[in-house]
Amino acid sequence: MTDSERDKLDKLDILAKRQDAVISIGIGGSYLGNQALFDIFCGSYWNHFSSEERKGYPLIYFVGQNADSASITDLIKQLRRNFYQKKRKLKVLLLLISKSGSTMEPMLAFQILSRNLIDFCELSVVAITNQNKGQIHELAEKNQWTCFNMPEGIGGRFSIFSQVGLVFSKFIGLDIKKFLSGAKMVEESCWSEKWSENPALAMAAIKFIAMKEYGVSAEVIMPYGDKFRAVGWWYAQLLGESLGKKLDIHGNIVHNGRIPVSCVGTTDMHSLTQEHQQGRKNKLLQFISAQEQNKDMDVVCEESGKQGVIKLSKVLSAALHANEKALADDGRMSCHVSMRTVTPFHVGALMYFFFLSTAYEGAMAGINSYDQPGVEDYKKILHSYLSECIEKV
């Protein structure tokens, strides 16, 4: 990041608190990491809190992650309702994120919002895109938007520590220095070539051997706690796009990869665990948890004739460990990555740990973990289908 961009980033603190709402527009890696950060540090009810409870930070919405007219229509209705309640134009910032500047879903969402919000909103735009080319770059120059560069060589699924994640973090008050310091700690701790001294390498080796020697063809990502649900979505993209490759680096057909399946504990212990526990032994479960919860409460519990008070977080933790043991007792594989507590530092460390482990496994498999040629196949077909549907204006 250049000094100029750092200056612009610092100014976002003030800009954020001048907004009624920020709408993050992106898909894939331009969406999933930010959704994960929002869920962890803001929670499901952020937009129901008062401005004081949000410490002056704006309402946050996500669009452009699907070509779904229903959800974007509902967002417009909600903002219009806020306009009537406040009896003034809303200050709304559109955070437009697309490396190519031509990604279909975000660009269509931006088009719809720009057209439909202008009557009752004061719109401003912050863009994150390629600084030298693309539709968004051209629009940013023409309209004098604040624009951040999406660096070359960083794929969307690896972009949470780049401008993509850092700019978004400013709008929710996340301490980005602590977030980056957590990533740096992992980077400095996980470079040994000895797996016994490098936990990211050790996990990569375990999963690689499980896949190649034990027939593991699926990885179930199972974080415990609602706030980590989107971490599962984020890691599923990282795993699928990085390791799911037809060719190795020498051009040989290998069809590498595991099917990523995202679920959440304890919710899915009451549905999917039946298959995990008694279905085919072709799965490895990846558990994610936090040892300490920032918010907790006491509940009365009775087990085995013993009644007393227990922390709800202890129930969550006990359920996870019971799941682990039941799987192990039946010879089924799992890994568990646990944070001590939920802070920007620890979340930064967690996400970078998965980056490194995935990269190490890609190297073991002899594949390129940093491209995604498979997604181009459907795009070519989709463009031809859409061209047949376009009606002349």
Q: Which role does the model predict for each range below?
A:
Residues 8-20, 76-91, 205-217, 276-281:
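Glycine-rich phosphate/diphosphate-binding loops that line cofactor/substrate pockets in enzymes
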Residues 1-7, 125-127, 192-195, 337-345:
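Active-site-proximal helix-loop elements at catalytic-domain edges
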Residues 17-193, 329, 380, 384:
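Glycine-rich phosphate-binding loops that contact phosphosugars or nucleotide phosphates
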